[in-house]
From Swiss-Prot:
The gene is rlmH. This is Ribosomal RNA large subunit methyltransferase H. It comes from Photorhabdus laumondii subsp. laumondii (strain DSM 15139 / CIP 105565 / TT01) (Photorhabdus luminescens subsp. laumondii). Its main location: cytoplasm. Homodimer. It catalyses: pseudouridine(1915) in 23S rRNA + S-adenosyl-L-methionine = N(3)-methylpseudouridine(1915) in 23S rRNA + S-adenosyl-L-homocysteine + H(+). GO terms for molecular function: rRNA (pseudouridine-N3-)-methyltransferase activity.
Length: 156
């Protein structure tokens, strides 16, 4: 199983890049984790936000690996505690398909992305900065993996 994080936005702050890359390097070779960045549409005073969202959504869905399970990161999604996320990760591994996790831009995810998703995951009821979500997802999935393999990273 391969994990893909497909996120709107490029040119992240150094601390985001460093945090995300740190967790990315920790993943085992049998569970590669790739980041695909989708350029954010230009937002200005007279921008057509609906059209920008549609275009970002089209690009995100085009980046999804064929046959991949799509999981959106969205406030109304399922809230998993760490042991539940570990169970989800095990379920995804048994399923055998790749998993594509989608993080939207400033206005969230396009309706097409939400419609294509098999699951939606909520990290928090809070609105989080989208760059920070990258680091939180990577850490959470690494922690879940550590539970499934009895790695000492996670402690109860």
């Amino acid at each position: 199983m391969k994990l893909q994080l497909i996120a709107v936005g490029t040119k992240m702050p150094d601390w985001i890049q460093a945090g995300f890359t740190d967790y990315l390097r920790r993943f085992p070779k049998d569970m590669p984790f790739d980041l695909i960045e989708i350029p954010a549409g230009k937002r200005g005073k007279n921008a057509d936000i609906k059209r920008i969202l549609e275009k970002e959504g089209e690009q995100m869905l085009a980046a999804v690996s064929k046959g991949s399970r799509i999981v959106t990161l969205d406030i109304p999604g399922s809230r998993w505690e760490t042991p539940q996320l570990a169970q989800q990760l095990e379920h995804w591994k048994r399923d055998g398909r790749d998993v594509s996790l989608l993080i939207g831009g400033p206005e969230g995810l396009a309706p097409a992305c939400k419609a294509a998703a098999e699951q939606s995951w909520s990290l928090s009821p809070l609105t989080l900065p989208h760059p920070l979500v990258r680091v939180l997802v990577a850490e959470s999935l690494y922690r879940a993996w550590s539970i499934t393999t009895n790695h000492p990273y996670h402690r109860e």
